[in-house]
Amino acid sequence: MYGPKNHGWIEVITGPMYSGKSEELIRRVRRVKIAKQKVQVFKPEIDNRYSNEDVVSHCGDKEGAVPIKSSEDILKLIKEDTEVVAIDEAQFFDKGILEVVNKIANEGKRVICAGLDQDFKGEPFGYMPDIIAVAEFVHKVQAVCMICGNPATRTQRLINGKPAKYDDPVVLVGAKESYEARCRKCHIVPKE
């Protein structure tokens, strides 16, 4: 995943909740710092589960981040000497995120995006499929199904312990109280 200096590219870390996406993003950011490269980390303001100003994995690892409202804010805040831009929870950003990550990569910077590829219905989530399509590197991670123990590729939303209905809102920020990892077979989305 390392190319020549001054050649930008996009890396995506994707999969369901509890698969280690933020943990992997944090690991890559730490390696960048060890290599003495300048890095900036961003996250959407809406992601305030564990911290307002850190990317935090479910296992407690954290890395400082700038919370932003809109993808355009990333372009306004990037410093000229920044070599690597890391973006967590990319699925929550507006349509402009695709143009933003392409612009940054085209300027010779490494872009690392982490986010859910599917929503709780098992459908493509936000603009993540678009980012995945233009990325040079895609790392799809799995969790463990909380029902059967098989590899989990989906996120099950639970409302009062029961699967959320298909027509429930797509965005509901939460953690263990409302979501769990499931495999294809154990993932349930009632139509009614």
From Swiss-Prot:
Recorded catalytic reaction(s): these are: thymidine + ATP = dTMP + ADP + H(+)
Picking any one GO molecular function of the record gives: zinc ion binding
Top-level taxon of the source organism: Bacteria
Known EC number: 2.7.1.21
List positions binding ATP: 15-22, 88-91
Residues annotated to bind Zn(2+):
145, 148, 183, 186
* Keyword terms of this UniProt record: ATP-binding, Cytoplasm, DNA synthesis, Kinase, Metal-binding, Nucleotide-binding, Transferase, Zinc
Listed HAMAP family: Thymidine_kinase (MF_00124)
Q: Supply the name of the protein.
A: Thymidine kinase
| Name of the gene | tdk
